[in-house]
Amino acid sequence: SKRYSPPLNYEKSDFSSPGVRGRITRLDNNGTPPQCLWRSFYNTKPCGSYCIHHIVSSLDDWGPCTVTGDVTIKSPRTPRRITGGVFLVDKNPNNSSESRLVVDFSQFSRGHTRVHWPKFAVPNLQTLANLLSTNLQWLSLDVSAAFYHIPISPAAVPHLLVGSPGLERFTTCLSSSTHNGNDSQLQTMHALCTRHVYSSLLLLFKTYGRKLHLLAHPFIMGFRKLPMGVGLSPFLLAQFTSALASMVRRNFPHCVVFAYMDDLVLGARTSEHLTAIYSHICSVFLDLGIHLNVNKTKWWGNHLHFMGYVITSSGVLPQDKHVKKLSRYLRSVPVNQPLDYKICERLTGILNYVAPFTLCGYAALMPLYHAIASRTAFIFSSLYKSWLLSLYEELWPVVRQRGVVCTVFADATPTGWGIATTCQLLSGTFAFPLPIATAELIAACLARCWTGARLLGTDNSVVLSGKLTSFPWLLACVANWILRGTSFCYVPSALNPADLPSRGLLPVLRPLPRLRLRPQTSRISLWAASPPVSPRRPVRVAWSSPVQTCEPWIPP
């Protein structure tokens, strides 16, 4: 009964009922099946405390090396290659005892035949603050059952084959005739016996028991449910949850619903109101065939945890776990030692997440950006490290914008600046000519310092964008500090009342153009305006779904 499970370059596959797996027998040069690698550990002596022999010897009967069972799928169109590889990753950064299955379909993203994902909108930080920074009661719904369990047609299973190499991926240098007592070949086999492999196999043994023998062999699997990325792209996932949110808004117009990818949040004025809405939504979703996971529903109260942020009525801040991790990493950075730019990339990615909540914003990380762009090593000085620590220890919330009328305008020329308010005109000159974008930024900073206005009118697109990383480093840091919490609205140069003062002319005060700030909500599909509900609904409205939600659908 010694049979060998093939590597991934198989010729013909049979599928069994438990996991739709396929195996064939491969013979060595002598015409006999080679011995199973898993059973070889049973006949050897342990090489140490982390030897796989300890796991293998815990059972006397590991069963045959083949999967038995009735073949449920026989397709003559089975392709002669697998679709992707499969591997395990941690459940989340805080839980390494559980794992989730990840399938590698990256071959479809390479070469001239690669498939591009459609672009989908991502809400920025200011949009989240404007939409969700309210004094409401919140809860998060887990709707993953709606799109993670889409059944696949049996005829399409052979086109999504996935291979697992088992233990033999680690022993590529181990030939098929190495189990004959050769010491050097046994040492090659015992190269698997590491602490990481031993702990992983021990965890799998506690879960699967005797089935671990089959997992140690290469095998080929097919899907019974569509995997993420095949049946549902990120774009379609965002559209799907947006449709669910729009449906909830139409039927419950007195609540707030927001969706991003697989995360859907629901808000109401009181907890009692929220509980009533939640019970109704559960029944409505169940009629649509969507089972909400009640155990994963999280009640947040006034502090909504969404996309890694804590959103309250006072603004948006990052979650404490991100701040603590960032502080720990930043304190462990060595001083006066060159760091590879790849390390700087990972550190900058962590710092970027919290940068909008610091006084200097992204501009404080410009030295790291330059080192990464030039692919050179970066040396942290003690002064720069202590400055970053002081910046990231004091975080300021991103507050929601208010719809107010603009009463302060700023403009500049390469040689001068001008400020116009409802009651005065101010102007000045620079010591030497400056680039126009730099001059406009300085004029906006002066207007903010002298008037304290939270809304400024300007005609420069660079200042309007708020991206100051293209300016000189110290100027960008100071401008971020001064203009923090300041909004901008665009005014054409011909209508800008600060245009003439910036040229050294002080005309008579005239009425200012009436410009009102519209809080930024971005044109995103995630917050699409729902059509109003007709006050007179038709009589014959059936909420019952044609899909059976209690019993599985069996084809005729």
From Swiss-Prot:
Gene Ontology biological process terms in this record: DNA replication
GO MF term (any one): RNA-directed DNA polymerase activity
Gene3D superfamilies (alphabetical): 3.30.70.270
EC number: 2.7.7.7, 2.7.7.49, 3.1.26.4
Spans traversing the lipid bilayer: none
Keyword Ligase belongs to the record: no
Reactions listed under catalytic activity: DNA(n) + a 2'-deoxyribonucleoside 5'-triphosphate = DNA(n+1) + diphosphate; Endonucleolytic cleavage to 5'-phosphomonoester
Keyword entries, A-Z: DNA replication, DNA-binding, DNA-directed DNA polymerase, Endonuclease, Hydrolase, Magnesium, Metal-binding, Multifunctional enzyme, Nuclease, Nucleotidyltransferase, RNA-directed DNA polymerase, Transferase
All copies of domain Reverse transcriptase, residue ranges: 70-311
Region (Polymerase/reverse transcriptase domain (RT)): 60-401
PROSITE patterns noted in UniProt: RT_POL (PS50878)
Keyword Nuclease listed: yes
Activity regulation details: Activated by host HSP70 and HSP40 in vitro to be able to bind the epsilon loop of the pgRNA. Because deletion of the RNase H region renders the protein partly chaperone-independent, the chaperones may be needed indirectly to relieve occlusion of the RNA-binding site by this domain. Inhibited by several reverse-transcriptase inhibitors: Lamivudine, Adefovir and Entecavir.
Binding-site list for Mg(2+): D142, D262, D263
Region (RnaseH domain (RH)): 402-556
Chain residue ranges for the region called Spacer: 1-59
Domain of life assignment: Viruses
Cited Pfam families: DNA_pol_viral_C, RVT_1
Function description: Multifunctional enzyme that converts the viral RNA genome into dsDNA in viral cytoplasmic capsids. This enzyme displays a DNA polymerase activity that can copy either DNA or RNA templates, and a ribonuclease H (RNase H) activity that cleaves the RNA strand of RNA-DNA heteroduplexes in a partially processive 3'- to 5'-endonucleasic mode. Neo-synthesized pregenomic RNA (pgRNA) are encapsidated together with the P protein, and reverse-transcribed inside the nucleocapsid.
Domain notes per entry: Terminal protein domain (TP) is hepadnavirus-specific. Spacer domain is highly variable and separates the TP and RT domains. Polymerase/reverse-transcriptase domain (RT) and ribonuclease H domain (RH) are similar to retrovirus reverse transcriptase/RNase H. The polymerase/reverse transcriptase (RT) and ribonuclease H (RH) domains are structured in five subdomains: finger, palm, thumb, connection and RNase H. Within the palm subdomain, the 'primer grip' region is thought to be involved in the positioning of the primer terminus for accommodating the incoming nucleotide. The RH domain stabilizes the association of RT with primer-template.
Classification via PANTHER family: REVERSE TRANSCRIPTASE DOMAIN-CONTAINING PROTEIN (PTHR33050), RIBONUCLEASE H (PTHR33050:SF7)
Family statement drawn from the similarity comment of this UniProt entry: Belongs to the hepadnaviridae P protein family.
Name of the featured protein: Protein P
Protein species of origin: Woodchuck hepatitis B virus (isolate w64/pWS23)
Lineage: Viruses, Riboviria, Pararnavirae, Artverviricota, Revtraviricetes
Gene designation per UniProt: P
